[in-house]
Amino acid sequence: MRIDLHTHSNRSDGTTSPADVVAQASEAGLDVVALTDHDTTRGWDDAADAARGVGIDVVRGIEISCRHRGISIHLLAYLPAPEGELFDEMERARESRVTRAERMVERLGRDVPITYEQVLAQAGPDATIGRPHIADALVANGVVPDRSTAFEHLLSNSGPYHVGHYAIDPVRAVTLVRAAGGVPVMAHPFADVRGRVVDDAVIEEMIDAGLLGLEAHHRDHTPEQVRHARDLARTHDLLVTGSSDYHGDGKPNRLGENTTEPDQYERLVALATSDVGVVRGR
């Protein structure tokens, strides 16, 4: 059984619809795929409907934007009930992203050709607006050749156009995911190629709050970082997952390039206590 537990659709910063993510996952030979868009569940229903048509199981999830002392942390939440404080926090994050995008485009527009309407045109229906959509508008306007160049030269956290956005504290996020009956797993915890990462002490605080897993197998981890994640998971009896972090054409990540072992997946599903079950398409 091949299992990919981290993908994005055009409901956040992916380029592919939820239904097409599911169809492509099936075509890639996956048996299980999780849809984990940033701070939104708006692709869940479409993904569930698609699963029943192509013979693949779908795990409904979210990737929650967190921040600890200025360091970005991503928390994957699997099978949480779509209500309550967790979802209030996600809506707050979504609204903050919109405000941030508007302000960044205003700053960029003083130097390069771009409007907020052009950014919206790059986003999917009900999408969580983010920097990738700004990058896509810059590409469409011929300012840069691709997303990577846009981030490197114009949209980085240290760049002159950067504006921050609200992100929940990771310990509180873990607590809210557990309260919603979900399974919290820290995404790519040691991927310093993406920017600064927290040390083990912060992860241990998250574990004390109820963190249940680490995404060890990810393209942004070095072999040493994979080993470190696995060792930490073993010490604390955490789940170990592997995933593609697929974004469609937005990133080079390919569906199924990293996967989760079946025993870890079965344990993850068993740990969920909400009524949000796996959508059985097989």
Can you name each region flagged by the protein language model?
Residues 50-207, 259, 263-282:
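Extended substrate/RNA-proximal surfaces in nucleic-acid metabolism proteins
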Residues 255:
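Short clusters of hydrophobic/aromatic residues that line enzyme substrate/ligand-binding pockets
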Residues 1-71, 155-156, 168, 174-175, ...:
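An N-terminally biased module of ancient metal coordination in phosphate/nucleic-acid-related enzymes
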